[in-house]
Regions:
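Alpha-helical residues within the helix-turn-helix
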Residues: 68, 79, 85-86
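Conserved segment of winged-helix/HTH DNA-binding domains
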Residues: 102-122
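N-terminal helix-turn-helix DNA-binding core of bacterial DNA-binding proteins
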Residues: 29-75, 99-106
Length: 122
């Protein structure tokens, strides 16, 4: 049996469950927070950035190493790292002439881990 992903089940009635609507409305985050959350998830919408995050999930790495790992130019990697840094997902530190990147904190690792768990569910 295959699921039809293009059809949505709908109610056959027009009953409003006001108690549930009000309960959810009271807990709903502010519009600005939801907008910021949507912007965060947009950053995860690029496979190159996901590959970079995966690499940094495993180890702190410099731009040169990430470029070799992903078979991309340093310029392309730097561009994506800039986007990730603006989204506060990665941080960097400079050691002499080498700039190392890593995930900002465990929250980023958890988002990544939860995403992988979700897509691997059967």
């Amino acid at each position: 049996m295959t699921k039809k992903f293009n059809s949505i089940e709908r109610c056959d009635c027009n009953v409003i469950h006001e108690d549930i609507v009000n309960q959810v409305r009271d807990k709903m985050p502010q519009e600005e927070s939801l907008y910021d959350l949507a912007e965060l998830f947009k950053v995860f919408g690029d496979s190159t950035r996901i590959r970079i995050l995966w690499a940094l999930h495993e180890a702190e790495m410099c731009v040169c190493d990430i470029a070799v790992l992903l078979n991309m130019t340093q310029s392309a990697i730097s561009h994506q790292l800039r986007v990730l840094k603006q989204a506060n997902l990665v941080k960097n530190r400079k050691e002499s002439k080498v700039v190392y990147y890593s995930l900002v904190d465990d929250h980023v690792r958890e988002i990544f881990d939860q995403g992988l768990i979700h897509i691997n569910e059967k």
